[in-house]
Amino acid sequence: MSLDIDQIALHQLIKRDEQTLDVVLRDSLLPTNAVVEEMMAELHRVYSAKSKAYGLFNEQSELADALKRSRKGDEDFLSFSRAATGRLRDELAKYPFAEGGVVLFCQYRYLAVEYLLISVLSSCHSMRVNEQLDLSTTHYLDINRADIVARIDLTEWETNPESTRYLTFLTGRVGRKVSDFFMDFLSAAEGLDTKAQNRGLLQAVDDYCADAELGKNERQAYRQQVYSYCNEQLQAGEEIALQVLAQELPKLGEKDFQQFSAEQGYALEESFPADRGTLRQLTKFAGSGGGLSINFDALLLDERIFWDAATDTLTIKGTPPNLRDQLQRRAGSK
């Protein structure tokens, strides 16, 4: 992994009671060595693999102003990180889910792009066995479960300040509250809506197929082609590029897919991140609720699975063998 650490600082938040978060500030930057590089490579990998929300700084963002001063050399990185940790404590303390942790600020380069990553990492307790086979307690940073993380694409921010996607953050296991916390700390507003972009893509595909009057099987085959490209991009960690997608797809009528989507006003970006859950709707129907969970290939609709809209009833012809076996055993036990 081509990841080069420029500067990294660690501080700590300690929860004393329900209302108090104390700050412990480090007096120097963390020296870059093999252990630090391995930690950052793992954190970068974990963060890159998770779903993220996008944002951009508000005009009055204190953190953005401080970061600009640091980038210009008017304030050193350590001072920037110490002041930001204080603001982080003030914002985090407002929320009931607030916990202590190690606060990490790392400025690094990856594939010619500069990033600033900010994270609050939890410490976990575990056991270790030494060479004498004695047991002792140990602590480690729970990087794989990190959910309080934000990252600023410094290259994008400085070269394209009008962008709506240079700032990303995780929604976290406690949902929207973590998003709100980061928005407050970063003084940021919501940016690119990834799910909306993906929903717009799906609508554009359906409308394009309908405009060409494709039959059911042809339409589903077209959706499958769209899904194959988008899923490849998702697996590679790359964005969906409309121009490339249009080149991959057969042209229907006089206009290719990119021309059609631009003229019909779907407000799609030239490229945007793939959203796994939304894209799955290209090839599958899925839903759950009331103790029922259903997931089936779209091709099965009107073939083996039939929906009666008037009565809101699904009829399934031919159940999966493992399900049928369970039903037969249950029926036989009565």
Curated annotation (Swiss-Prot):
GO CC terms, sorted: bacterial nucleoid; cytoplasm
Highest taxon listed in the record's lineage: Bacteria
Location relative to the cell: Cytoplasm, Nucleoid
Keyword Lyase appears in the UniProt entry: no
GO MF annotations, alphabetized: double-stranded DNA binding; single-stranded RNA binding
Family: Belongs to the YejK family.
Protein name: Nucleoid-associated protein YPN_2714
Native species: Yersinia pestis bv. Antiqua (strain Nepal516)
